[in-house]
């Protein structure tokens, strides 16, 4: 299915040679992408009018306040103070716990807010700031991040990977599945985060690898790692694929060295304010690995949380033991696809390796929260044309796993709307041909699918029914 590594020229459906630009014009993909991108942008705008994490809920509010507070800190304090506990930077109040690139992003967005609404990022006095204009500016920072990072990266991936093959309607369907992923929209534009930046950088790195620009890929993926450390979910796939390609070249040691220098150089530039002092360096590292939070957070649909109903992991094992257990479980489940890519690297195998690697981390790694499902969803979205059935059900249950968070953030209305929109687009007339064929499966398969959908609806109803009751009981205990 995938293009062979190093293939420079593709064939179109008529067998003629073509390049990316010819394909874009001939298939009119550029116009399709623009229309879908505009619609995806408007959907994001609509979702952003709804509440966000911790809205009107003092004293610590939620992720919205965390992002605003990081802008306040990075704007008003020198870089060496950003990760250090002090009288001006209380790390117990939403202290920075992401790598330096997130801090730089917060600084740039803070400059934008200070120009138009300085009181929203003033030191100390802006805590819990929730003015209408401040919220509007904050929402625009996420929207602009999507436009600058995610949208161009998706376009590059489609051009690089699908040039010369595939029907126009299939490509348009794939673009819609990626740009209108309901989970990402709800987390970034509802709950309030900037996952679009790290995911956009990762997609850009994938596109660079598929076009044999390994040095560019190393820089982009290093930037993704330095924006959100959870991008390490993809690291085994990148490492094994690039190593496999290097080993097949004339001078493998030189090739590996070049890629290593690109990674080290990128990290050195990003970490420059902190590499001059071991104390400062270790201080940042300690903020990036919050093991004290425990094995998992909230209602995360991974192995440890699911099996905790029967096996009380947190009671039976110490944190140190669980760290080792989760580490080896993650490594062992990543290993098959890593070995395959080192032995026989291919573009399609690389995409499946990304899926396997990210799922291994999501299911078995230490300290996973419900928003981490966005990471395995990314390669699943990129593979939606190859695996439409599995992509649909992964998205379905990813949304279901996020439902408690959406209830807590009062985002049930956009949750239901995006759930419906996803299925409308998935089965859209003229969309992916395989999806229409699957509308009439075998009787057993049809029964199982219907049963699973009913179970999902039942779980939604149970949670909505019981959640108010648990809130009342907890308030009575207090």
Tell what function each PLM region has.
Residues 31-44, 146, 175-176, 262, ...:
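Alpha-helical transmembrane segments
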Residues 45, 108, 152-160, 208-209, ...:
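Hydrophobic membrane-targeting alpha-helices
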């Amino acid at each position: 299915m995938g293009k062979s590594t190093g293939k420079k020229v593709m064939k179109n459906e008529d067998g003629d040679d073509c390049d990316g630009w010819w394909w874009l014009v001939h298939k009119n993909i550029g116009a399709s992408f623009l229309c879908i991108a505009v619609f995806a942008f408007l959907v994001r705008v609509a979702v952003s009018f709804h509440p966000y994490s911790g809205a009107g809920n003092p004293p610590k509010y939620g992720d919205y306040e965390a992002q605003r507070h990081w802008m306040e800190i990075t704007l008003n304090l020198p870089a060496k103070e950003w990760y250090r506990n002090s009288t001006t930077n209380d790390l117990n109040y939403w202290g920075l716990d992401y790598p330096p690139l997130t801090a730089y992003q917060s600084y740039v967005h803070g400059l934008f807010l200070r120009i138009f609404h300085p009181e929203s990022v003033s030191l100390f006095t802006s805590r819990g700031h929730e003015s209408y204009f401040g919220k509007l500016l904050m929402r625009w920072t996420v929207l602009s991040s999507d436009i600058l990072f995610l949208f161009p990266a998706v376009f590059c991936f489609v051009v690089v990977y699908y040039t010369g093959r595939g029907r126009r309607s299939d490509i348009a369907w794939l673009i819609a599945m990626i740009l209108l992923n309901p989970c990402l929209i709800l987390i970034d534009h509802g709950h309030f985060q900037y996952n679009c930046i790290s995911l956009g950088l990762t997609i850009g790195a994938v596109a660079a690898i598929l076009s044999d620009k390994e040095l560019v890929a190393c820089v982009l993926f290093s930037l993704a790692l330095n924006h959100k450390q959870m991008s390490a979910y993809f690291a085994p796939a990148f490492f094994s694929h690039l190593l496999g390609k290097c080993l097949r070249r004339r001078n493998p040691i030189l090739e590996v060295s070049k890629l290593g220098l690109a990674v080290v150089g990128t990290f050195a530039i990003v970490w420059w304010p902190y590499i001059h002092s071991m104390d400062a360096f270790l201080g940042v590292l300690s903020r990036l690995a919050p093991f004290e939070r425990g094995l998992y957070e909230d209602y995360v649909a991974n192995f440890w949380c699911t099996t905790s109903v029967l096996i009380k992991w947190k009671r039976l094992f110490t944190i140190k033991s669980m760290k080792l257990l989760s580490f080896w479980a993650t490594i062992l489940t990543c290993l098959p696809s890593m070995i395959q890519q080192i032995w026989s690297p291919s573009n399609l195998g690389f995409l499946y390796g990304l899926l396997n690697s990210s799922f291994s981390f999501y299911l078995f790694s230490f300290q996973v929260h419900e928003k981490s499902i966005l990471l395995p969803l990314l390669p699943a979205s990129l593979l939606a044309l190859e695996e439409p059935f599995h992509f649909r059900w992964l998205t379905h249950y990813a949304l279901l796993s996020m439902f408690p968070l959406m209830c807590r953030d009062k985002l049930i209305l956009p949750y239901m709307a995006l759930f419906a929109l996803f299925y409308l687009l998935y089965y859209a007339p003229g969309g992916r041909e395989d999806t229409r064929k699957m509308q009439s499966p075998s009787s057993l398969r049809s029964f199982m699918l219907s049963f699973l959908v009913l179970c999902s609806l039942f779980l939604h109803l149970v949670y909505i029914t019981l959640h108010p009751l648990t809130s009342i009981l907890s308030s009575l205990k207090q």
